[in-house]
Design a protein with these regions (language model features):
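Catalytic beta/alpha-barrel core
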Residues: 40, 60-71, 96-102, 117-129, ...
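Short beta-strand/loop segments at the ligand-binding rim of alpha/beta enzyme cores
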Residues: 31-37, 90-100, 139-149, 201-206
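Conserved N-terminal beta1-alpha1 strand-loop-helix module at the mouth
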Residues: 11-95, 102-103
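Well-ordered, non-membrane alpha-helical segments in soluble/globular domains
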Residues: 73-84, 104-108, 159-160, 186, ...
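Catalytic alpha/beta core domains of metabolic enzymes, predominantly
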Residues: 126-250
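N-terminal acidic, proline/glycine-rich, low-complexity intrinsically disordered segments
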Residues: 1-6
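Short, acidic/polar
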Residues: 42-54, 104-111, 155-165
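Short amphipathic alpha-helical segments and helix-helix/interface helices
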Residues: 51, 80-87, 109-114, 129-134, ...
Length: 250
């Protein structure tokens, strides 16, 4: 057998589309997506601890509210008090509020977050999507419209079409995350994302291939137009996520 080409692998051993990746600090500024520390914590104390531990490794913090026990029962005053505390703790980092689950509860939480959080993550299939986007704009809060496929990798055409569809709904940032069952599928979603960014007046995008076979997409996303790449604290919030400290080294 011939010698393995080490230049085409990262420390985890997976190939990066035939390119040797530059160290993160050596890459051009416009090629480096911001790292979002995605936190799925069962209680507020743990959430605050994770922010303190990893805030030097990220530019954005995402609170996955549905993972916090009792979050469905928050009153508006309780939620805004907690969110304000978290926002202060982030100290200049952008804050995303995300809620996956019951749409009615999620929309209520997201409305309360407007004006405090910098960005709210709204599912592309939300029945009140346009209404939520308009309300967020009135309250000067950016919207990230997200679309997830957890069991397959759609075709490039499907992905590109979905980006355009989300753009028409008025989101400020468009995110698509799909599961990769083989490494080559990471290339599919990144190429589709890159094609979308060639369009005039395109919106900022995030493209992620979930799963272990999609990990390369989390490192080189910026080369294909993504403005954000997601990482975790002590516990992954999606398949294939890197720890924020590890990802920040690229």
């Amino acid at each position: 057998m011939g010698k393995k080409d080490k230049s085409k692998e990262n420390k985890k051993g997976f190939r990066l589309f035939g390119k040797k990746r530059a160290n993160r600090k050596d890459k051009k500024k416009n090629e480096r997506p911001e790292i979002c520390l995605s936190l799925s914590c069962t209680n507020i104390e743990s959430l605050k601890e994770q922010i303190e531990e990893y805030k030097d490794c990220c530019q954005i913090v995402e609170w996955c509210v549905d993972s916090t026990l009792g979050s469905d029962d928050y009153t508006q005053e309780e939620f805004k008090t907690v969110l304000t505390e978290i926002k202060k703790l982030c100290k200049g980092k952008k804050l995303i509020v995300d809620y996956k689950g019951n749409e009615e509860v999620g929309n209520r939480i997201q409305r309360w977050a407007m004006g405090i959080a910098d960005i709210i993550d709204i599912d592309a299939d939300n029945s009140r999507l346009k209404e939520m986007v308009k309300e967020a704009k009135r309250k000067r809060t950016k919207t990230l419209i997200s679309y997830h496929v957890f069991d397959r990798m759609p075709s490039r055409d499907e992905i590109a079409t979905q980006f355009v569809k989300m753009e028409r709904n008025g989101g400020d940032i468009l995110k698509i995350a799909c599961f990769a069952s083989k490494e080559s599928e990471s290339y599919e979603i990144l190429e589709a994302a890159c094609s979308y960014t060639q369009l005039a007046n395109h919106k900022p995008i995030v493209a992620i291939a979930m799963g272990e076979e999609g990990q390369a997409s989390r490192i080189c996303a910026g080369d294909f137009g993504s403005v954000i790449t997601y990482a975790c604290g002590s516990t992954p919030t999606a398949p294939g996520q890197f720890n924020a400290r590890d990802l920040s080294r690229y």
